[in-house]
UniProtKB/Swiss-Prot annotation:
The keyword Cytoplasm applies. This is Oligoribonuclease. GO terms for biological process: DNA metabolic process. NCBIfam families: PRK05359.1. It comes from Pseudomonas syringae pv. tomato (strain ATCC BAA-871 / DC3000). It is found in: Cytoplasm. Its main location: cytoplasm.
Length: 178
């Protein structure tokens, strides 16, 4: 059910860091309420890319996405970039009115750059503001360095979103004073 207080969490995995030369290979979304309770998990989508495109990945991406099985899932996927955008939009429209939720995640500006370049309708659905958990991570590192949130490193989109939500809960409990 749509609620303008719900939050849209998104994570992308890409072939690299440059939205002009690299592409999205996986995406996932989660909807939470304003208290960070998960309401729904959206589709986890491996976006098909050609072997030629995948061969252009640098060593880190080749090793990471190959080791996690993502590269193989991308090769086997039949879902195009446009289909992935449409599926994700259909999901979030069930939960959040247009332009009411900031884009939520970790280092979310990078994801937003890729959405702007490759999935403009989806990028435009978000409010112009960002809810970037990495901002709190940077502030905590400087103002409360004893606070450490331990993250995994699967670099799979759904796992990364779950960790981002857990990390924001951690900072809410231990860093943000009521």
């Amino acid at each position: 059910m749509q609620n303008k207080q719900n939050l849209i969490w998104i994570d992308l995995e890409m072939t690299g860091l440059d939205p002009d030369t690299d592409v999205i290979i996986e995406m996932a979304t989660i909807i939470t309420d304003s208290e960070l309770n998960t309401l729904a998990e959206g589709p986890v989508i491996a976006v098909h890319q050609s072997d030629e495109t995948l061969a252009k990945m640098d060593e880190w991406n080749t090793r990471q996405h190959g080791g996690s099985g993502l590269t193989q899932r991308v090769r086997e996927s039949t879902i195009s970039m446009a289909d992935a955008e449409a599926q994700t939009l259909a999901f979030i429209k069930l939960w959040v009115p247009e332009r009411s939720s900031p884009i939520c995640g970790n280092s979310i500006c990078q994801d937003r750059r890729f959405l702007y370049r490759h999935m403009p309708a989806l990028e435009n659905y978000f409010h112009y503001r960002n809810l970037d958990v990495s901002t709190l991570k940077e502030l905590a590192a400087r103002w409360a360095p004893e606070l450490k949130f331990k993250k995994g490193s699967t670099h799979l989109a759904l796992d990364d979103i779950r960790e981002s939500i857990a990390e924001l809960r951690f900072y809410r409990e231990h860093f943000i004073k009521p």
